[in-house]
């Protein structure tokens, strides 16, 4: 079969468990609603038309045709009045006849739009992690995100299901069903499981491409399924590791399907796409070198923060306050990681009313993790590109890392001043580490334009908690 003798490849019994519409399901359960039968949407900043849809129940998606990650203005109704939006409907090519309008307005009235509660989602996630640990040791569990994770059940199958008449495939299915049952009984949340008696990659592909559409919400893809199932994935972007940009690059090479990728020349792929091309070739053939205990980790490309502002920022001083705060927040993360940056980048997105492209710019710098120096670089980049206009989103990113011990001091540097700043910076970081980011704030944090205090109450940019740099 193909290039590989799969009998020589590593074999593990993997379950990849995904919580169905996790945030929305948690909100439904907390309100005594059935997660699959209620129309509910978790929306950040629902008080304005740019509210971000973070999650939605399956019924919400079915009725309004919206998946996760969208905007309030993408919905066919006004979130405040719950009336049909003819403007949005026409823009999206939706019908506007009276029956459809009535259908949307009736469901809009019955739909719950709720703010995110990240602390609640984390608490439920911890409960689910404890369920996982009933079936495998902590070393056998790899959380992939807050709502999904891998469990290596290789050493657990025979312990929980000693029946020798059953195949490992059957045992994996039985044990995965028990995990689903326990999650539902203890949290009220439904889960989907991708399984594989081969490796984590095939378990992930089974989840994304089959398990979500089966009555049991489980599916198993192993080595014997590569040609029939993996090669038959209809959209290349449904394959792990292929986004729109990579898809275009593959198309340029004359590759338009997973089968064509799997049967292409690996040397040519490596020449055109580097190691990423070679890795995709292996994956298209069902080969995955990672495992749950030592998962593949991509090289860190950078550290950054970005945010959508609650209103349009027009005044230059207000925009500078935001950029200063973000430069400092990312600098804190940089020092925590024991690194210095050699490349500073910023992103500035304009308001919808501004007909102009976003600003993307960067500059190479001498290795540093000094807040004051990095802030100066960020502001310099901004002033070099910005002339005028209302701003609605900003981002700051540091990359090109070197070890913290690396440093270059020129004859023109004030060494005493640099050492003094470093000691002060270390002291500030230590205080914030122990007492929280807001224990020490600059005076401009009290200004109306500042976002430091507001974002200190967030987790992952949403309600409850804080950013890494805003502990």
Language model segments and positions:
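Glycine-/small-residue-rich active-site loops that bind phosphorylated ligands and cofactors
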Residues: 120, 370, 403
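Gly/Gly-Pro- and Ser/Thr-rich, intrinsically disordered tail segments characteristic of DNA damage-repair
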Residues: 1-279, 418-471
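Short, charged/polar, Gly/Pro-enriched secondary-structure boundary elements
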Residues: 157-162, 355, 402-409
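Core structural elements
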Residues: 146-149, 340-354, 397-406
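Short histidine-centered catalytic/ligand-binding loop motif
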Residues: 117, 161-169, 308-316, 362-369, ...
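DNA-contacting surface of Y-family translesion DNA polymerases
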Residues: 3, 7-9, 16, 61-62, ...
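C-terminal hydrophobic structural anchor segments
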Residues: 379-434
């Amino acid at each position: 079969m193909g290039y590989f003798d799969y009998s020589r490849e590593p074999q593990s019994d993997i379950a990849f468990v995904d919580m169905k519409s996790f945030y929305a399901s948690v909100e439904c359960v907390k309100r005594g609603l059935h997660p699959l039968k209620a129309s509910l949407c978790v929306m950040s900043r629902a008080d304005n038309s740019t509210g971000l849809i973070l999650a939605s129940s399956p019924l919400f998606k079915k009725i309004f045709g919206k998946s996760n990650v969208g905007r309030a203005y993408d919905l066919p109704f006004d979130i405040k009045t719950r009336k049909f939006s003819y403007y949005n409907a026409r823009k999206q090519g939706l019908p506007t006849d009276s029956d459809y309008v009535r259908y949307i307005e009736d469901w809009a009235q019955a739909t719950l739009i709720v703010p995110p509660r990240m602390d609640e989602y984390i608490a439920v996630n911890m409960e689910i992690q404890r369920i996982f640990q009933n079936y495998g040791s902590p070393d056998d569990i790899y959380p992939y995100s807050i709502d999904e994770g891998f469990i290596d059940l290789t050493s657990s199958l025979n312990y929980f299901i000693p029946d020798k008449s059953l195949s490992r495939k059957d045992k994996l299915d039985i044990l995965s069903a028990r995990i689903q049952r326990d999650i539902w009984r203890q949290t009220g949340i439904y889960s989907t499981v991708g399984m594989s008696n081969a490796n984590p990659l095939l378990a992930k592909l089974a989840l994304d491409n089959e398990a979500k559409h089966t009555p049991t919400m489980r599916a198993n893809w192993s080595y014997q399924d590569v040609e029939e199932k993996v090669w038959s994935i209809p959209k290349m972007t449904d394959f792990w590791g292929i986004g729109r940009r990579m898809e275009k690059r593959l198309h340029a090479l004359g590759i338009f399907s997973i089968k064509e990728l799997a049967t292409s020349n690996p040397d040519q792929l490596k020449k055109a796409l580097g190691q990423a091309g070679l890795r995709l070739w292996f994956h298209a053939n069902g080969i995955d070198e990672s495992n749950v205990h030592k998962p593949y980790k991509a090289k860190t490309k950078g550290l950054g923060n970005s945010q959508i502002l609650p209103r349009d920022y027009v005044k230059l001083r207000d925009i500078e306050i935001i950029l200063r705060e973000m430069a400092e927040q990312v600098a804190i993360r940089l020092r925590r990681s024991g690194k210095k940056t050699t490349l500073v980048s910023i992103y500035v997105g304009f308001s919808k009313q501004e007909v102009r492209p976003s600003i993307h710019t960067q500059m190479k710098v001498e290795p540093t993790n000094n807040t004051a120096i990095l802030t100066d670089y960020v502001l310099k980049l901004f002033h070099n590109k910005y002339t005028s206009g209302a701003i609605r989103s900003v981002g700051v990113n540091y990359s090109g890392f070197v070890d913290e011990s690396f440093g270059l001091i020129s004859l023109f540097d004030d060494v005493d001043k640099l050492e003094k700043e470093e000691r002060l910076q270390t002291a500030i970081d230590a205080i914030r580490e122990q007492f929280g980011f807001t224990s020490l704030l600059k005076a401009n944090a009290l200004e109306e334009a500042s976002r430091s205090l507001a974002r200190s109450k967030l987790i992952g940019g949403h309600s409850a908690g804080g950013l890494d740099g805003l502990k």
